[in-house]
Amino acid sequence: SAQSIAPLLDPQPGDRILDACAAPGGKATHVAELVGDQAEIWAVDRSAGRLKRVAANAARLGLASINALAADAANLLEQRPQWRESFQRILLDAPCSGLGTLARHPDARWRVTPQSIRGLLPQQQALLDGLLPLLAPQGVLVYATCTIHPDENQKQIQALLKRHPSLCLEQESQLWPDQASGGDGFYSAVLKRA
């Protein structure tokens, strides 16, 4: 499922692309490969330690277009005001409950509670609201999770569209866990700014 995210961005050579919550860098490197390493890609994650894996993966694959930045993606505009409306593509693979990965992580049954899900919602909202000012006009934002919970997915996007009427929902997909193929449950929304 994770490999289906990067193509949703429809990245183009020359684009400026932001991968928020990027570590360990699989999606950023996939994006770089899709554009032939001909874009400016920023991989942002709060964990400087985890970002080292992004740099290592990019180096291993010979990709020079990926820049790593340790920062809270929800507050990037405060840290980098020059980034306002400067990204044609933004990818947010948001922190989530992971309920779509129960087949691979059965322990989640015991750690995910209604309270823990409610605790994630403000963080997801803050990331979405914090990243939108960085999106260029006509830019594309992809929101993705590995959960099947509607509060983290469809309801989060419905609320975002109410708060930001300049956004248009271009595509939405909910994949359910598939025992036959071993695929995880996964959600994605492709949004375009007017």
Language-model region placement:
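S-adenosylmethionine
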Residues: 1-194
